[in-house]
Amino acid sequence: MGMHYRQLGNTGLMASEIGMGCEGFGEDNYAMAKTLIDMAKEHGVNYIDLYASDPKLRAAVGEALCGCREKFIIQSHICSVWKDGQYKRSRDLLEVKAGFEDMLRLLQTDYIDVGMIHYCDAVSDWEEILNGGILQYALELKEQGRIRHIGLSSHNPEVALAAVRSGQIEVLMFSVNPCYDLQPADEDVEQLWNAEKYKNPLVNMDPLRQELYETCQRMGVGITVMKAFGGGDLLKEELSPAGKALTVYQCLHYALTRPAVASVMAGVHSAEQLSQCISYEDASEEEKDYAPAFAEFPKISWEGHCMYCSHCAPCPKKIDVASVTKFLNLAVSQDCVLETVREHYEVLEHHAGECIQCGTCESRCPFGVSIMENMRRAAEIFGK
């Protein structure tokens, strides 16, 4: 079947669903960078995230991209600098500027497709970025054509929402997986995996995270995903906070079915791991299906919350229930229905007003969603 591509928000870029993080590029004395980039090119993976500031890693990537730079969308991080022989997240403008120039030199390119303002998890930090010169510098780089689009990476939905609503970013790099999505906003990313937070049963997605995804969808801000596998813990029953292992395909599919998500950055360490992620594109719907696993999570309940898994299908009237529900959620989260949401709803082949209230969808839903009521509401809101 081959790689699928998605629009990255309103940037005009078409991103491969499977992207690649740089975690494994340093393996085998940095030779892994060329191995993975060559493999990515062969299989249509065109999106690479480079958060690391290690000059040897950046140089290895620059060498690997020689002759094929234009085949890739490079998402590289402003404010990730190398100082005194180690990585540093910096908001010092002199350090940031020097780090950016060094990045371009080592990557052997004169522009970055997505200049990602690096790792902002505190509201006070976002305010510093806004008022301390970092955002202004990013805007200057964009005006010069040295970065084509401005992004922000964050693990905190409160900060991410503020950045998205500011209208200043076009791409959000955000941590997305079914366990993180249960947790409220926190300025300490380590709290997302704190075992204490999972001791008591958890119910449904954190409302702020849901609002973030829907706001990105409405405003045309594309999401690139990090932490889809929770650092690998979600793939192992003994390490997963959910108490049950998920597969690579299930983790990828969960992230790719969130609103506004364009590409998942797989932090692979070997050709075998990258191959497994790429093979998602040819996996069956049964292999991708995360709903049965979620329904069996001993510590987590998604009762009443639509996961867009399409287990409700087939509909006798051929309504795409998952899409209708997604547009309904986008509509009711605002005081009025935005034209972009209405337009997306209009082009659906069948609409909620065609629902005959037979209830077969609800009998199939593993999460007890009130689908018939959702169809009634959607028909009322959208007028058909």
Predicted feature residues:
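N-terminal binding-site loop/beta-alpha segment at the start of enzyme catalytic domains
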Residues: 1-78, 110, 137, 143
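Beta/alpha (TIM)-barrel catalytic core signal, keyed to glycine-rich beta->alpha loops juxtaposed to Asp/Glu
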Residues: 120-323, 333-347, 373
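Short, acidic/polar
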Residues: 28-40, 91-108, 154-162, 246-254
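Active-site groove signature of glycoside hydrolases
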Residues: 102-126
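Acidic-and-aromatic substrate-binding clefts and catalytic sites of carbohydrate-active enzymes
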Residues: 26-31, 49-59, 81-83, 123, ...
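Short cysteine clusters
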Residues: 306-315, 355-361, 365
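Active-site mouth loops of central-metabolism enzymes
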Residues: 21-31, 78-97, 123, 127, ...
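Conserved, mostly hydrophobic/aromatic
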Residues: 8, 20, 48, 61, ...
